[in-house]
C-alpha cells in the first residue's frame, strides 16, 4: 500500500506574538514539507483559554503571511474541535482504557509526580486520565535526534486527557487532530521530544496511525532559557521579515550565501526551497540564540 502524501503542520498556541523560536519551527517544518513535495498546514492550539492572549491568533496568522508561510489547507482551531475530543475520551472510558480521577496536585506530589492509582475519592472536579499499565519502553527513531526510548509507565504514569477544570489536555488534542488531519510528519521543537512516547501510547489506544517525527533544536536565550513568550522573547517584525528569515535559515544549518540578501520574501523562499538540505540540520537538542546575528536585538 503506497504511503500517503507528505503533510506537515505548524501548531502555535495563541499566548502571544510569534518569536524567533516560533519561526524556527514554522520555517523548518515548511521547508521539510516543500522539500518532500508535500503540503503544510497551520493549526491553532487554543484549548487553554486562561493562557490565551486576545487577538494573538489573528496576529500570529498575519505574521506567518508576512513571512510568506501560507497554510495549504484551511486553518484548524482546536477550540472548535470539542466533539472530536469528546468522542475519543468516551471511547477510551467505555473500553476501560481511561478513567476519572480527582487526585489533587498534592496527591500527585505524594506519588513522586507519577500517577499509577487514585488515592482520592471522586469529587466534583474530575480529570480524565489514560490508563498506562506496565509495558515495555516505547521507542521511535526521530529523523533528526535519533533513537528515543522512554518507559512511559515508570517515568510518566497515567496521562491526563481532560483536566479537572474541564479543559482538554494537549496530549489528547494533538493526537486526535494529527490523525484527523492526516498529518504524516510532525516537525516541532525538541522540548516536545519527551512527549512523543506518551502520544504514541495514546495513538495505539485509539487505533490511530503514527506519523513520522523530527524534533528541531530548541532555541535558548542569553540566560540559557527556552526562547518563549513567557520569557519576553521579542516579537517577529512583520514589516521587516528578511533579517529573521536569514537568521532562521542559518540556525537550521543551511548555507548562508544561498539566499539573496535583498529580494522579495517570495523570492527568498523560492531560493530556500531550491537550496534546502535536510542533512545540514543541526543534530542537537538546543541552540544558543546569537541576538546580533539574528537581528533581534532589543532597543
From Swiss-Prot:
Catalyzes the tRNA-independent activation of glutamate in presence of ATP and the subsequent transfer of glutamate onto a tRNA(Asp). Glutamate is transferred on the 2-amino-5-(4,5-dihydroxy-2-cyclopenten-1-yl) moiety of the queuosine in the wobble position of the QUC anticodon. Pfam families: tRNA-synt_1c. This is Glutamyl-Q tRNA(Asp) synthetase. GO terms for molecular function: ATP binding; glutamate-tRNA ligase activity; zinc ion binding. The gene is gluQ. Zn(2+) binds at residues 101, 103, 118. Gene3D superfamilies: HUPs. A motif ('HIGH' region) lies at residues 12-22. GO terms for cellular component: cytosol. Belongs to the class-I aminoacyl-tRNA synthetase family. GluQ subfamily. Its cofactor is Zn(2+). L-glutamate binds at residues 9-13, 45, 170, 188. A motif ('KMSKS' region) lies at residues 226-230. Binds 1 zinc ion per subunit. One of its GO terms (biological process) is tRNA modification. It comes from Xanthomonas axonopodis pv. citri (strain 306). InterPro entries: Glu-Q_tRNA(Asp)_Synthase, Glu/Gln-tRNA-synth, Glu/Gln-tRNA-synth_Ib_cat-dom, GluQ/Sye, Rossmann-like_a/b/a_fold. Keywords: Aminoacyl-tRNA synthetase, ATP-binding, Ligase, Metal-binding, Nucleotide-binding, Zinc. NCBIfam families: PRK05710.1-3, queuosine_YadB. ATP binds at residue 229. Its EC number is 6.1.1.-.
